[in-house]
Amino acid sequence: MALTKADLSEHLFNVVGLNKREAKDLVELFFKEISLSLERGEPVKLSGFGNFNLRDKGERPGRNPKTGEEIPITARRVVTFRAGHKLKSRVEKNVKPKEEGES
C-alpha cells in the first residue's frame, strides 16, 4: 500500500495534535516548497532522507515501436532522487529474503 498525502495529514493529526485543516495545509506546503525549489533549479536536500536533483537530458533519437519510424526525443529536464545513507540502511534492515520461486 502506498503512503499518500492524506496518510501524512492523518498522522500529523493523530501524533502531533494539529487539527485536520492544519495538518493538510502543512503537508501541502511541504510539497509545494519542494516543487518550487526544483522549479527554480535548486536541489532539495532532506537530511537523513535523501536528495532531489535536476538533470538535463539532451535530445536523442527515438523510435515508434509500432511503425519503427525514427522520432526525435526532445531535450528535457528531469528530477532524480538519491536516497541518503540513513534511509538506505533503514530500508536494508527491513528487507525480507525472497522465497524460492518468487520474482
From Swiss-Prot:
GO CC, one annotated term: cytosol
GO molecular function: DNA binding; structural constituent of chromatin
GO biological process: DNA recombination; positive regulation of metabolic process; regulation of DNA-templated transcription; regulation of translation
Record field: compositional bias (Basic and acidic residues): 54-69
Cited SMART domains: BHL
Keyword Transcription tagged: yes
Keywords of the record: DNA recombination, DNA-binding, Transcription, Transcription regulation, Translation regulation
Classification via InterPro entries: Hist_DNA-bd, Histone-like_DNA-bd_CS, IHF-like_DNA-bd_dom_sf, IHF_alpha
Region Disordered, residue ranges: 50-72
NCBIfam families: himA, PRK00285.1
Family of the protein in this entry: Belongs to the bacterial histone-like protein family.
Function: This protein is one of the two subunits of integration host factor, a specific DNA-binding protein that functions in genetic recombination as well as in transcriptional and translational control.
UniProt subunit comment: Heterodimer of an alpha and a beta chain.
Protein name (record): Integration host factor subunit alpha
Gene (name only): ihfA
